């Protein structure tokens, strides 16, 4: 299990990356070393991994510049994305409020359009990915794959402290964002308005979990976790011990699906 990583810690690992189409992005690393950070640090490129790649958490925050577009593409690792601020479009769908997107490996998605505000979103993976494979240039590499494409969007409910959010919760309110599937894929928002223990799915029911604090604060394994803090839990580890602070917390759990031969 990784340690809790705060937003402030991640900002110390912030690097600029200009996409091939000229879109400016800024990448803040939370967990692991992603391909942008490797380039920024002058590290050698990594070889491709067979699929599924070995379990290796890679998590970072993307700030996409105003009035920009990231073209359609796919990755070679399973991932979640959490849109947390800004406006634009994901494909043809408006980015409205907090949104979770999941895309399994080799599933093309996007484009991501940012309007004049720009957009911010977390990218969370459980394995190494060498970088985007742009479409349609890399369409040929998808031929012959028998696995069906798999991705989707889930809206995150209003949070504690928001105008439409819960004002008093007895115990813990669990709200489904991505319905649970047989292989363990799921995402659930847990909210409290006071001190309370929070229990999520058993880690070995999937292939790794991320927990992201969206509002308030809590203790995760006796480590302080404030807004925009996160932690990764491996499937062979015990469930994290989470206790909401006295003002409550809104914390999002995202679990990756199991994979054959992993």
Annotate the PLM regions.
Residues 1-54, 132-186:
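A short, N-terminal "cap"/entry segment at the start of jelly-roll beta-barrel domains
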Residues 65, 75-90, 200-221:
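Glycine- and acidic-residue-biased ligand/ion/polar-headgroup-sensing regions
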Residues 50-52, 69-75, 91-93, 112-114, ...:
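Short histidine-centered beta-strand/loop micro-motifs
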Residues 53-66, 182-197:
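Short, flexible domain-boundary/linker segments around small modular repeats
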Residues 99, 228-229:
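Structural motif
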Residues 47-89, 93-98:
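The feature marks the first
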Residues 94-95, 105-134, 183, 224-226, ...:
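Ligand-binding loop in jelly-roll beta-barrel domains
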């Amino acid at each position: 299990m990784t340690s809790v990583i705060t937003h402030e810690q991640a900002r110390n690992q912030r690097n600029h990356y200009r996409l091939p189409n000229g879109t400016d992005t800024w990448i803040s690393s939370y967990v692991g070393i992603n391909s942008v950070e490797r380039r920024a640090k002058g590290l050698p490129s990594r070889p491709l991994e067979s699929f599924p790649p070995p379990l290796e958490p890679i998590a970072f925050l993307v700030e996409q510049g105003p009035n920009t577009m990231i073209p359609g593409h796919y990755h070679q690792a399973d991932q979640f994305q959490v849109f947390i601020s800004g406006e634009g479009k994901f494909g043809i769908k408006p980015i409205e409020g907090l949104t979770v997107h999941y895309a399994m490996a080799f599933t093309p998605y996007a484009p991501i359009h940012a309007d004049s505000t720009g957009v911010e979103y977390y990218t969370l993976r459980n394995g190494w990915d060498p970088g985007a494979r742009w479409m349609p240039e890399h369409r040929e590499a998808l031929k012959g794959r028998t696995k069906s494409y798999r991705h989707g969007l889930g809206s995150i409910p209003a949070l504690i402290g928001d105008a439409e959010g819960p004002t008093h919760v007895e115990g813990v309110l669990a709200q489904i964002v991505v319905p649970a599937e047989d292989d363990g894929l799921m995402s659930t928002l847990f909210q409290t308005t006071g001190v309370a223990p929070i229990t999520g799915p058993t880690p070995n029911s999937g292939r790794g979990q991320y927990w992201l604090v969206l509002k308030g604060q809590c203790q995760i394994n006796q480590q302080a976790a404030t807004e925009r803090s996160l932690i990764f839990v491996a499937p062979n580890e015990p469930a994290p011990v989470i206790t909401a602070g006295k003002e409550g917390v809104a914390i999002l759990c995202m679990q990756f699906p199991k994979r054959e031969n992993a």
